[in-house]
Regions:
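N-terminal Rossmann-like FAD-binding beta1-loop-alpha1 element of flavoenzymes
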Residues: 2-27
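Glycine-rich FAD pyrophosphate-binding loop
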Residues: 20-43
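N-terminal FAD cofactor-binding segment of flavoenzymes
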Residues: 43, 56-79, 161-177, 234, ...
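B-type heme-binding environments
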Residues: 78-163
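Active-site/ligand-binding neighborhood in enzyme catalytic cores
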Residues: 185-193, 198-316
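C-terminal segments that line or cap access tunnels to active or ligand-binding sites in enzymes
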Residues: 267-278, 321, 333-335, 340-508, ...
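Conserved beta-strand-loop-beta-strand element in the redox core of flavoprotein oxidoreductases
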Residues: 311-331
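Active-site-proximal substrate-binding core of FAD-dependent oxidoreductases
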Residues: 546-589
Length: 600
């Protein structure tokens, strides 16, 4: 069976990944000259790596974790290679080597100061994970402090498993730490929740988490008005400036109660709640190895091929038309998967006279205009926290950024010593330099506006002074190359879609009414309900399983995000209340508690 996939973003690549393993013939057509969609990075003409935006990987990204472990890589490391037999020879107190996740460590100098005493001697020439399991120290695995100490003693890699490294190993193992900066250094606001804040948030989020049938209603309610005036000032700033704001790339003005409560729920379920970033540019760490792996499995890629029309015949797709170098090519297949952003897809639907489906996509038509930028300094800015991500709370464009060099490993930046990769979360607001929105400025003016807003912040300015850095040290300024000037405004070649209180209920299913047309992407319905790389992978897996079901083939692995058993049980009880037109379970529980308290 032949499958044609339109779009080589995360979701399209996921479909190819899952189906090629099941024996399908896969062809991918992509309008750009490289894969990755919104996640891709690239290197400019000066070989400086650049990202669409800084990209965080949450602790509940289980579908991403699973698929990333299947993508082999060759990690470029400046370390020696050792065989397992060589490591086994170093097993004494005065010469002690060990292995951890295929890396080789010389712990000889650490033996005497090891807080666990002589247990470390048992690791000589062995796999540390096995020793920790044997002596009850499993918690050492991926513990941040343990890993930081261990990495000081790394001397090489294990030859036998060098090629078995995966994309998952390219994740920076350290936690991404956020810090809030205000324009006035003495205007620091406390970011914390008091017990009344916790009670209110428990009530607010509990209504969502402990619901099922009525949950969709909470995705239509804006979060921001529910917090204003209800939380303490420190609590309010903690939520809006961080969790429901630029800290995680959300627009607080369009975030719904349902999305935020879901985000909190899935985070709370995790034993370790850290967010991570890649240890090198995203395409080099993930996308490029993935494409190479898929090609090795037989997937055929056709870049610079843009879908222009869908030819429908009764209840099936007859063919697709794609454009390549001014030439129109007709494509035929058994099944078709459209994995492009909903805005471009809607344009195709209209051109193809598929108006019934287009009407549904019209309801998704809310563009998220976050703009990505890079600033390179020829002197190092010494940030006071490790592995930091920074939020300029008072900046008109709600700027968030992080220094790439603190997170990337062995990535040559040339003359650049500090490379800030950032995002304008709210570029539609008026800037403080030109008094215009970022979307109505020319590209060069926008760069100057960003620099101006950065240096308006006393915290950033003082940090630069301590590092002997000024605006004169900026040698590289860039707006992500998807953006260009048109009719006095900035527009992007690839529009970004995110779910919010307006469009959540209109997210489409992966299966269409046409028997051989499927769609995939993070705009489709997923169990995670949060626009993210995880939802893109999940959507790809859902689409893959629909096609596998069609041909009676075994399904691929798919992690369905869901509540823990006790929460699921209470949600089902709330369904009964909902059918009886009672209020939410949380409210009813509070009423019962108050009644019992008064009666008692």
């Amino acid at each position: 069976m032949k499958i044609i996939i339109i779009g080589a973003g995360i979701s399209g690549l996921t479909v190819a990944h899952e189906l090629v393993k099941k024996g399908f013939e896969i062809e991918i057509y992509e309008k750009d000259n490289e894969a990755g969609g919104m996640a891709k990075s690239f290197r400019n003409k000066n070989n400086i790596p650049t990202e669409h935006s800084w990209r965080g990987y949450g602790p509940f990204y289980y579908n991403f974790f699973e698929i990333s472990k299947q993508i082999p890589i060759n990690i470029r490391e400046n370390f020696n290679e050792y065989t397992l037999d060589e490591v086994k020879e170093h097993n004494t107190e005065n010469d002690l080597w060990c292995i951890y996740k295929n890396d080789v460590y010389d712990l000889t100098d650490f033996v005497k100061s090891h807080p666990g005493g002589s247990i470390i001697l048992q690791a000589g020439g062995k796999n540390l994970e096995d020793v920790w399991d044997e002596y009850g120290y499993e918690w050492h695995n991926d513990n941040e402090n343990v890993m930081n100490t261990l990495n000081k003693f790394k001397i090489g890699v294990l030859v036998e498993s060098y090629s078995s490294k995966s994309v998952y190993d390219n994740l920076n193992k350290n936690r991404l730490n956020f810090e809030f900066w205000y324009n006035k250094d003495n205007d620091k606001k406390s970011h914390s929740l008091d017990y009344l804040d916790f009670l209110y948030l428990f009530f607010l989020f509990g209504k969502v988490i402990l619901s099922d049938d009525r949950k969709i209603n909470y995705f239509k309610v804006r979060l921001y008005p529910l917090l204003k005036g209800k939380l303490s000032k420190p609590g309010y700033h903690y939520i809006t400036d961080y969790i429901a704001g630029p800290g995680y790339g959300f627009d607080k003005n369009t975030m719904s109660l349902g999305h935020f409560a879901t985000f909190i729920e899935y985070t709370l379920y995790q034993k370790e709640k850290k967010w991570q970033v890649m240890s090198m540019p995203t395409s080099e760490a993930w996308i490029d190895p993935w494409v190479k792996h898929l090609k090795n499995l037989g997937v055929k890629f056709y870049f610079n091929h843009e879908l222009i029309k869908i030819n429908k015949k009764k209840d099936k797709i007859d063919s697709l038309l794609v454009k390549h170098k001014n030439k129109v090519i007709k494509l035929n297949s058994d099944d078709y998967v459209i994995s492009i952003n909903p805005f471009n897809f809607n344009d195709i639907l209209k051109k193809s006279n598929m108006m019934e489906m287009s009407i549904m996509y019209n309801k998704l038509n809310i563009v998220n205009n976050q703009i990505s930028f890079r600033l390179g300094f020829n002197k190092k800015i010494n940030f006071e926290i490790k592995n930091g991500g920074f939020v300029l709370v008072d900046s008109p464009y709600n700027i968030t950024f992080y220094p790439q060099e603190d997170h990337w490993i062995n990535v040559d930046l040339g003359e650049i010593k500090t490379l800030l990769s950032g995002t304008l979360i709210l570029p539609y607001r008026k800037g403080s330099l030109y008094g215009k929105s970022g979307l109505s400025l020319k590209l060069d003016n926008l760069k100057e506006e960003i620099i101006h807003q950065l240096f308006e912040c006393d915290v950033f300015t003082n940090l630069c002074k301590k590092s002997d850095v000024s605006k004169k040290n900026i040698i590289f300024k860039e707006i992500y190359n998807d953006w260009y000037e048109k009719d006095g405004y900035l527009v992007t070649k690839n529009k970004k879609w995110v779910n919010n209180f307006i469009n959540e209920e209109y997210r489409p299913l992966q299966k269409t009414d046409l028997e051989n047309l499927f769609i995939s992407g993070s705009h489709c319905k997923t169990s995670i309900s949060i626009w993210s790389m995880e939802s893109a992978v999940e959507s790809g897996k859902i689409t893959s399983n629909l096609i596998l079901d069609k041909y009676n083939k075994e399904n691929c692995y798919y992690y369905k995000h869901q509540s823990i058993p006790i929460v699921k049980l209470l949600s089902k009880l709330d369904n009964i209340l909902y059918k009886l037109h009672f209020k939410n379970l949380v409210i009813e529980m509070i009423i019962i508690i108050i009644f019992l308290f008064i009666k008692g």
